[in-house]
């Protein structure tokens, strides 16, 4: 997911704003499948500048709360639409149904 709204608007005021939108998008996709961020097993964060890591990490940590899925962060040469951050995740509905929030 990158920082596109449902209307297709790209949010690019700051890397924090991008990250917030990306996480909202992930929550929406997970919600449509009957899941939440608590169902996430692993995330991969793609950054175009590793200097943005601390700011992205702050937003990510607030969104995830006490849940701490496995995570990798990778610096990349570029992302679609000039995005500075993209996050992909692997989730399982079984973890949510069983009341488990992490491995």
What is the predicted function of each stretch?
Residues 1-103:
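Short, polar/acidic, helix-capping and beta-turn segments at strand->helix junctions
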């Amino acid at each position: 997911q990158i920082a596109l709204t449902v209307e297709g608007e790209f949010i690019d005021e700051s890397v924090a704003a991008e990250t917030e939108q990306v996480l909202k998008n992930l929550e929406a996709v997970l919600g449509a499948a009957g899941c939440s961020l608590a169902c996430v097993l692993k995330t991969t964060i793609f950054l175009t500048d590793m200097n943005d890591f601390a700011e992205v990490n702050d937003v990510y940590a607030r969104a995830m709360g006490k849940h701490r899925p496995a995570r990798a962060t990778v610096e990349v040469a570029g992302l679609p639409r000039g995005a500075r951050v993209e996050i992909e995740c692997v989730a399982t509905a079984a973890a949510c149904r069983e009341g488990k929030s992490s491995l």
